[in-house]
Structures are given as C-alpha cells and as structure tokens.
Amino acid sequence: MSNEVERVYPRLLDFVRKKYVSKNLLRVTLTGEDLIGFPEDQNGSHIKVFFPNQASGILQLPIREGDKVIWPEHKPVPRAYTVRQYRAQSNELDIDFVVHGEGTPGGGWALKAQTGSQLGLIGPGGPDPLIEPADWHIMAGDLSAVPAISAILEKMPSQAKGYVFLEVDDIEDKHDISHPEQMVIKWLVRDPNQAQPVLAMAIEQLPVPQGAESLSAFVAGENESVIACRKILRNEYRIARDKIYAIPYWKRGKNEEAYHEERHVVMDEEF
C-alpha cells in the first residue's frame, strides 16, 4: 500500500449489515461520521483495515503525532482489503471478505459482526486506473481478488474486450458479475493435486488476440499464482511492464505479518 494511503488518519466505522455474495464471500456494509468525505469513484482501490486486538477483543486505533505513528496498548490487527463500493448518498461502504472460518482476523470479524461491531480504515490508495487502457485485456485472480476485479469490470467502457479468469476452491463461489459484453468471464475450480497454478495454465492456453495493437493485464491473488501469471504475460504475450498490475494478496502457509516484506519484493521484480 502506498505512502499516500498510510498518511491518512484512520477512520472509525460502524457495522450496518452483511450478506453473502457467494458461499465463501461475505459482504459487510459499514458507515459512520468518519466515513463522510471518503473519496468517490474509488471502487476496487486498496484500503488498510484495522481489526480488534485478537487477545483482548478491544479496538483501539493508532494516531499520528508529526511523522510518528503511536500505537495503542491494545494494538489492532491490520489487513489489506478492497473497496467494493462506496455510496456517498447513503454514506455506506461495502467490503467483501473471504470467509473459511473464524481463524483469520478479517474473515472471523466479518462472520461475527453485528450491531455495535466496529473497525478502523485508512485509504483508499493504489494505482489509478487499476487496469491500463488497451485494445484487449487479460484479468486473473482467485476469490480474494474477485472484489477488485468485479469493481474494475463495472468501471470499464462498454466496448472493452478481453478475458477474465477467476479461480475458486468451491464451485458454489461462482456468481453473477456485471461486465462489458465482450469481456469473457471463465470460472476455474482449483484442483489441490495440480502442481501448476490453474490461472497461469488458463492464460498460457489463451490465443493471442488478432489485430490487437495493445494489451493490458490485472492479476491478483496467491503469491505463486501471481508470479506464474506475470511471467507468462511478460515473456509470452510481451505485455509491457507498465501495462501489467500484478499484486500478490497472500501466500499459502504464511500470515500477513510473515509475508508483508516479501510481497513488496515480488511486486518490484522485473520479468
């Protein structure tokens, strides 16, 4: 997440309601006085969310004093998420959470959230646009990337062309997504016994579009999958580095704290 985002004072937000988008994707709607003035037209952008301290269950947000960040006694748990939708008229913000149980800070909070539940937020940030203008687009991601990809598709021009590959562990996570007619969406169910990342295989088998003078791509999700996809996009499709936004959200076997620095190394690598 950019330095610009990290300079924004944390907002304290209140739970409003929640609903399932699919079997393992839960949408939580938030509001609050601190949300007033949240930037519009930032659907799909990155945000950093602060959850209650896991030991005490107390939510205390950090404060800034000059160039210093002062952390409270009950340090909150930070995680990166996506703005699914912000509605200024009702002052409501939607965040979609991947939920596989109560063991993770974000998914666990979303499952338990009820009237009176709160979280902190800074942002939004990240590149704008999230996918560069081009004649043809390639988008790929797992369930954690579906909120961002859905938001991007909603903002794309109606004449946009390309392919979208969405990887899920459970076919019941397949759901309708609004998209330009010529952006073809393909849902892929991951085989845990398959060695090669399913998204990379799908991109590799995709025929290079005829007559397209420019290509752009957006890839997000698990670390190894993002790296594999990016290599193919750079080495086989010859898409320019500045036309690819590839961001690993997570790494299998590691939590956010253990993976944070490695993520930035991966994002800065050249292929």
From Swiss-Prot:
All copies of domain FAD-binding FR-type, residue ranges: 8-131
EC main group: oxidoreductase
GO biological process: cellular response to iron ion starvation; iron import into cell; siderophore transport; vibriobactin metabolic process
GO terms for cellular component: cytoplasm
Catalysis performed (reactions): 2 a Fe(II)-siderophore + NAD(+) + H(+) = 2 a Fe(III)-siderophore + NADH
Record keywords, A-Z: Cytoplasm, FAD, Flavoprotein, NAD, Oxidoreductase
InterPro entries from the UniProt entry: FAD-bd_9_SIP, FAD-bd_FR_type, FNR_nucleotide-bd, Riboflavin_synthase-like_b-brl, SIP_C, SIP_fam
Record SUPFAM superfamilies: Riboflavin synthase domain-like
Keyword set includes RNA-binding: no
Subcellular location: Cytoplasm
Origin: domain of life: Bacteria
Cofactor names: FAD
EC number: 1.16.1.7
Family to which the UniProt record says this protein belongs: Belongs to the SIP oxidoreductase family.
Function of the molecule: Ferric-siderophore reductase involved in iron removal from the siderophores after their transport into the cell. Involved in intracellular removal of iron from iron-vibriobactin complex. Vibriobactin is an iron-chelating compound involved in the transport of iron from the bacterial environment into the cell cytoplasm. Ferric-vibriobactin reductase catalyzing the reduction of Fe(3+)-vibriobactin, a catecholate siderophore synthesized by V.cholerae.
Protein name: Ferric vibriobactin reductase ViuB
Organism, as annotated: Vibrio cholerae serotype O1 (strain ATCC 39315 / El Tor Inaba N16961)
Lineage start: Bacteria, Pseudomonadati, Pseudomonadota, Gammaproteobacteria, Vibrionales
Gene: viuB
